[in-house]
Regions:
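Cysteine-centered metal-binding/redox modules
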Residues: 1-171
């Protein structure tokens, strides 16, 4: 998205409760999406001549229904590596999230999976996926057990980087 959130990794977007900031006129309850329309409809905020602006003060401090922790870092990654490379990486992350949700979600892990795919690096997610695919015992597990197994793998990777896979609510 414009601001560094990744729509394809957002539970609201996945549930079709949000059109994303590209949803067109009238869908911009977000001040950053409105701002983009007022500044020539830039694809990413870093492309705006006024970036960074006051809208980015404390933007990573708290989460909503999606983690906000990497917004600035993700915008910098897109700026540094190029939008095409950044978007290609996000597409791969969306595919991995889809695998987790389609095959291993017991109905209680969607938020955890979305947060993990947002915060972990693509290579780390690919390593988790490789481990899952090469575990011949996984087919004998119930969906609930599979879901717990995947959650544990993701939490273990996150723990090595001191990443908490929970949303941070404003107090």
């Amino acid at each position: 998205s414009l601001c560094g959130l990744n729509c394809g990794l957002c539970p609201m977007f996945l549930n079709k409760n949000c059109p994303g900031c590209g949803g067109g006129e009238g869908n911009q309850s977000c001040k950053i999406a409105r701002c983009s329309m007022e500044h020539g409809s830039v694809q990413y905020c870093f492309q705006c001549s006024e970036h960074p602006c006051e809208k980015y003060d404390h933007i990573d401090d708290f989460d909503s229904f999606i983690t906000h922790r990497r917004r600035k870092a993700d915008l910098e990654k897109a700026r540094h590596s190029g939008v095409e490379a950044y978007n290609a990486e996000q597409i791969e992350k969306v595919k991995i999230l889809d695998i987790f949700l389609s095959n291993y979600n017991d109905g209680r892990k969607k938020t955890l999976f979305c947060i993990a795919v947002n915060l972990l690096e693509l290579q780390e997610l690919q390593a988790v996926l490789w481990e899952i695919e090469h575990n011949s015992d996984i087919e004998m597990l119930t969906l609930k057990e599979k879901s717990a197994y995947i959650a544990r793998l993701l939490k273990d990777v996150a723990a090595t980087k001191n990443i908490d896979l929970k949303l941070r609510k404003k107090k």
